[in-house]
């Protein structure tokens, strides 16, 4: 669940948080190698990987450069792939945990927490 939370957080940073709680692309401006960046590295041709790496590691502040990086991550499918992977992590964890827990309010809350991790917008 923790890894899924982080993947969703990284993706939200690029797609935008509800009510603009954080600036879109803050992680790029900070030069952070997030899960979507790592995912893009496995999807992009080598020349684009190098360009992405150089851009992110330079900690860009120009909104146009940050927007171009986000567009590149969208275009290569990295953000959608991250969301699918987060969903799969939560579903797999639940499949393993479900038979071990007796039906209870706590079990329902735990399941709801897993859904929240995936569906949150802030």
Regions found by a protein language model. Give the residues of each.
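All-alpha prenyltransferase/terpene-synthase fold signal
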Residues: 1-122
């Amino acid at each position: 669940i923790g890894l899924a939370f982080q993947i969703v957080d990284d993706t939200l940073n690029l797609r935008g948080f509800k009510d603009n709680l954080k600036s879109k692309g803050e992680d790029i401006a900070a030069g952070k190698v997030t899960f979507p960046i790592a995912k893009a590295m496995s999807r992009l041709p080598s020349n684009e990987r190098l360009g992405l790496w150089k851009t992110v590691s330079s900690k860009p502040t120009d909104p146009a450069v940050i927007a171009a990086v986000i567009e590149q991550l969208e275009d290569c499918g990295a953000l959608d792939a991250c969301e699918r992977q987060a969903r799969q992590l939560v579903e797999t964890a639940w499949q393993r945990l479900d038979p071990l827990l007796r039906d209870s309010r706590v079990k329902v809350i735990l399941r709801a927490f897993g859904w929240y991790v995936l569906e949150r917008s802030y």
